């Protein structure tokens, strides 16, 4: 199974979704004062969407900092995005932005804490990504 790296806000929706996956996961620190996370294996990034539909503010700052490290960026295999369908076309926008910029697939979008079906789909994606990367 592919590694999981995730970012979660204080609301904790993304963290709760990742916990339901029941896989080892590393969390991107929220604070600049925390030691930065550096990955050494291919991973799938799971993140929430910020903002009000503006692609410039959809990706959380800590995720941008994490991906600005070329070592971290080189190992990303795909993206899973959380969001809220109340935001219409902006639902999961952060995932689309990161997938486009990193040239990796957007594997799935889930609402709030996700459903059992979302969990099953993401588990399948993680297993597939691990097969693809070796």
From Swiss-Prot:
It holds the Pfam family Flavodoxin_NdrI. One of its GO terms (molecular function) is FMN binding. InterPro entries: Flavoprotein-like_sf, RNR_Ib_NrdI_bac, RNR_NrdI. Belongs to the NrdI family. PANTHER family: PROTEIN NRDI. Probably involved in ribonucleotide reductase function. This is Protein NrdI. The gene is nrdI.
